[in-house]
């Protein structure tokens, strides 16, 4: 029997007032628990009313209570909650981080994709900084070599679209989360805008089911071996794996961290798997890394594959795809 059954509109005498159960509920919930209201209605109607029926009707009328059972007396916020990151339900997923097109390492990316294709992987997550957007950088400009020109925005976007198209020839679905480089576009626009602008720029506006761009900076893989948080965190630490270990303890799940251009794997203090998945950009093409010395660690290329629910961390030297191809 549904909550809209006729007895909800049956005239009753309750609390010395002639009313109906539906109308009585609208004020009674302010002072009574659902169990108490069910008992009062059972007595007034001469039939058994279950507390869960009262709860369902109360909720359908928008009469909310707190977790402690108190009535919610303030108007609910009309603004969205940001608690639904993109989720991939699979045991086999490829993660590419910091590709930074048009400065990608084509050979490295090709080797990684070849292995993923060999293993029958259908989904890839782009873990932030898919685009470099050098032309939108707010960093100080530099001197150019005599035969060098600065990248134009149109050329960067075109290269990103070509890379995206190539991915879709190997994978059924691409999930792209944001990184700090994509945020350069927002800083230049100086306004909040939909991720659909990136969809259009990459030429994927008619392919939104296969090439998904999320406003989140992380995604979650729901695998048979647990939850795996693929993230492009705000922080980039000098000590490899530090950010990932802290995030694993904060969110209580396995973590694959991008952004730091570091590489390695470990476990968190609570025993969760942590990986810094390296970058897919060609470090030799990054002016800030090559033209001036710094004390930051050497950039490490890499990629991550969840294969049959288990982690495989790839590296050009220490774990090359050729080991499995």
Each language-model region and where it sits:
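DNA-recognition alpha helix
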Residues: 35-46
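Mobile, glycine- and charge-enriched loop segments
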Residues: 75-106
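Core catalytic region of metal-dependent phosphoesterases/phosphodiesterases
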Residues: 96, 101-209
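Conserved beta-sheet core of the metallophosphoesterase superfamily
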Residues: 227-323
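Short acidic low-complexity segments
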Residues: 206-224
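Major-groove recognition helix of helix-turn-helix-like DNA-binding domains
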Residues: 47-72
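Short, amphipathic alpha-helical "recognition" segments used to contact nucleic acids or chromatin
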Residues: 8-32
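Beta-strand-turn-beta hairpins that frame and shape the catalytic cleft
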Residues: 84-94, 219-229, 269
């Amino acid at each position: 029997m549904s909550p809209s059954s006729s007895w909800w509109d049956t005239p009753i005498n309750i609390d010395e007032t002639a009313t109906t159960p539906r109308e009585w509920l609208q004020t009674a919930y302010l002072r009574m628990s659902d169990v108490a209201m069910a008992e009062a209605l059972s007595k007034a109607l001469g039939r058994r009313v279950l507390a869960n029926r009262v709860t369902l009707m109360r909720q359908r009328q928008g009469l909310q209570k707190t977790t402690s059972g108190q009535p919610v007396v303030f108007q609910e916020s009309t603004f969205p909650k940001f608690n639904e990151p993109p989720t991939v339900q699979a045991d086999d997923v490829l993660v590419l981080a910091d590709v930074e097109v048009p400065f990608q390492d084509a050979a490295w990316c090709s080797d990684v994709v070849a292995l993923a294709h060999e293993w029958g992987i259908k989904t890839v997550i782009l873990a932030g900084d898919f685009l470099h957007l050098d032309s939108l950088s707010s960093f100080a400009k530099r001197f150019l070599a005599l035969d060098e020109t600065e990248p134009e925005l149109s050329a960067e976007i075109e290269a990103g679209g070509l890379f995206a198209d190539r991915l879709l020839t190997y994978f059924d679905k691409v999930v792209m989360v944001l990184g700090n480089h994509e945020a350069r576009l927002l800083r230049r626009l100086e306004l909040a805008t939909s991720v659909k602008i990136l969809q259009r720029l990459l030429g994927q506006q008619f392919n939104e089911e296969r090439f998904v761009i999320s406003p989140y900076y992380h995604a979650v893989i729901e695998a048979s071996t647990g939850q795996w948080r693929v993230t492009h965190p705000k922080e980039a630490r000098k000590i490899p794996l530090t950010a990932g270990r802290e995030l694993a303890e904060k969110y209580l799940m396995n973590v694959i961290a991008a952004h730091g251009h570091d590489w390695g794997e470990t476990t968190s203090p609570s025993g969760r798997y942590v990986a810094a998945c390296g970058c897919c950009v060609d470090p030799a093409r990054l002016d800030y890394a090559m033209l001036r010395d710094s004390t930051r660690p050497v950039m490490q290329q890499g990629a991550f594959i969840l294969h049959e629910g288990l982690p495989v961390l790839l590296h050009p030297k220490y774990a090359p795809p050729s080991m499995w191809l």
